[in-house]
């Protein structure tokens, strides 16, 4: 039985989207299909043959649309963005009753393409496939990768590159920028319809509240706070936290210039277009909070009370964000350090460590990995944690405090907690570049290998130990690019 599409977004008013068919490609070839994800969402490879994944054919029941949205890009307002190179085929309802968008990226021009060709290069498709699947394996809410197809066509960027179509799965593709699009047009009916849709789809518990729009803001803010905390705890830098890349469902979306920190610094930026460090590792909570302020302004007119009352209530909800974030982040740091029962002073201990890591530019992931190994082996010299510091004096002083703090704990419980919080394998930037460069030469081995390693980020993989390592000096990636 072919997959039954049930396209709730396409039933919203017509100005929410533009109906558009994908543009066919010359000679599509399936590079990778994610069978495990397909099973999870209740579809099969038979439902999505290569022609469908390339945009050369439509599956039965699909209603292809490009979504309208606006957004703040690096703080600057853009009243119309929209899906310029993506088409939402429709929605499928999984065995668990959850709804999933199936979207093709790189499927050709839409009315929102502006001057773009609507196509995607293979490199960014591979990056998104690898990183989104790695994030899922790390337990971080994210859009997912169902497939990637090569097109047999070149796309022209700085140079001609092999083309690809990427199939993305998401809880939805509704963004803060979707609300901004309708708010900027003063379209209250559209805002109401969108808010009702989002509540039904993502936050049903808000429906029974006195002011559902206010409850929606609070729930969405909690999800964003917890999401950004999870990013930071694995050293992830999104790179382009514009409001149009802020998912209302609280999933990580749009992996353009993202990166993982190697040598730690809170001001770390990789995105080539982030010239002022707006989206640096340590700035991400502040930006998420700012994005939610933009959402609040869109929802404000839906409050039935006076403007003054409404503003006060919305501000009160927004003011909870820093504490919600701090709670999630501090609990996560505690787990990374194996602090089993939170105590006063824990945050200072963690902050002192991060200062030390930044001062000595220590590799973030490798440090926590070796600290975990030290607890497992009860041997500081064997774990190699010392070798990460050019001057270990500061670390020795910190380590003495940490060991005193954890001395009354069961070391087995501590090791288990740390193992579950400190990944061994992350999508290191130089490994991603290696996989992309090889794939552009039609060698897909490094891509497949990277996916295999990153599917089990917390497990020892003796045969793949090289994937733990930071880059050698000649392999360091200093900048990442959007690839649009």
Named regions from a protein language model:
Residues 9-13, 100-110, 195, 199, ...:
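Active-site-adjacent bridging/hinge elements
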Residues 21-23, 117-119, 214-215:
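Short, contiguous strand/loop micro-motifs
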Residues 125, 154-238, 249-355:
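ATP-dependent phospho-/nucleotidyl transfer catalytic cores
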Residues 8-12, 86-90, 150-155, 246-255, ...:
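Short, mixed-charge, low-aromatic patches
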Residues 240-241, 246:
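Hydrophobic HxD+1 residue recognition
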Residues 1-8, 19-21, 97-102, 161-166, ...:
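Short, functional N-terminal and low-complexity linear motifs
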Residues 27-30, 35-209, 248-251, 291-292, ...:
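Conserved ATP-binding subdomain of kinase catalytic cores across diverse folds
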Residues 1-69, 275-484:
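Regulatory N- and C-terminal appendages and interdomain linkers associated
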């Amino acid at each position: 039985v072919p997959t039954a599409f049930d396209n709730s977004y396409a039933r919203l008013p017509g100005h929410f989207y533009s109906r558009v068919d994908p543009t066919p490609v010359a000679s599509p070839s399936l590079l990778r299909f994610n069978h495990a994800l397909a099973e999870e969402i209740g579809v099969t490879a038979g439902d999505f043959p290569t022609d469908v994944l390339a945009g050369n054919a439509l599956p039965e029941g699909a209603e292809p649309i490009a979504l309208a949205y606006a957004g703040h890009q690096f703080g600057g307002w853009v009243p119309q963005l929209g899906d310029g190179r993506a088409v939402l085929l429709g929605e499928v309802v999984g065995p668990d009753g959850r709804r999933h968008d199936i979207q093709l990226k790189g499927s050709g021009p839409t009315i929102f393409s502006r001057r773009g060709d609507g196509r995607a290069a293979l490199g960014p498709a591979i990056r998104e496939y690898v990183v989104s699947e790695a994030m899922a394996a790390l337990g971080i809410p994210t859009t997912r990768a169902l497939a990637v197809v090569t097109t047999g066509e070149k796309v022209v960027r700085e140079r001609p590159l092999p083309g690809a179509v990427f199939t993305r799965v998401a809880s939805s593709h509704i963004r803060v920028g979707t609300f901004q699009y309708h708010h900027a047009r003063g379209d209250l009916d559209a805002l109401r319809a969108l808010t009702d849709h989002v509540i039904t789809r993502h936050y049903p518990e808000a429906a029974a509240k006195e002011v559902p729009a206010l409850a929606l803001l609070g729930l969405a803010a909690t999800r964003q706070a917890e999401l950004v905390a999870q990013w930071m705890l694995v050293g992830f830098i999104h790179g382009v936290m514009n409001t149009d890349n802020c998912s209302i469902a609280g999933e990580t979306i749009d992996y353009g210039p993202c990166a993982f920190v190697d040598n730690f610094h809170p001001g770390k930026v990789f995105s080539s277009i982030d010239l002022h460090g707006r989206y640096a590792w340590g700035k991400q909570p502040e930006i998420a909070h700012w994005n939610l302020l933009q959402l609040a302004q869109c929802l404000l007119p839906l409050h039935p009370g006076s403007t003054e009352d409404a503003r006060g209530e919305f501000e009160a909800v927004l003011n909870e964000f820093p504490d919600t974030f701090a709670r999630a982040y501090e609990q996560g740091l505690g787990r990374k350090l194996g602090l089993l029962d939170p105590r006063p002073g824990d945050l200072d201990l963690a902050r002192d460590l991060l200062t030390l890591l930044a001062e000595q530019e220590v590799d973030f992931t490798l440090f926590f990995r070796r600290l975990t190994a030290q607890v497992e082996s009860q041997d500081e010299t064997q774990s190699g944690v010392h070798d990460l510091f050019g001057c270990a004096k500061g670390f020795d002083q910190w380590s003495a405090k940490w060991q005193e703090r954890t001395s009354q704990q069961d070391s087995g419980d501590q090791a288990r907690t740390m193992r579950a919080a400190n990944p061994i394998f992350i999508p290191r930037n130089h490994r991603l570049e290696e996989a992309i460069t090889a794939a552009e030469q039609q060698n897909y081995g490094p891509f497949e290998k990277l996916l295999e390693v990153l599917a089990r980020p917390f497990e020892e993989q003796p045969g793949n130990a090289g994937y733990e390592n930071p880059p050698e000096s000649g392999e360091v990636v200093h900048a990442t690019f959007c690839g649009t």
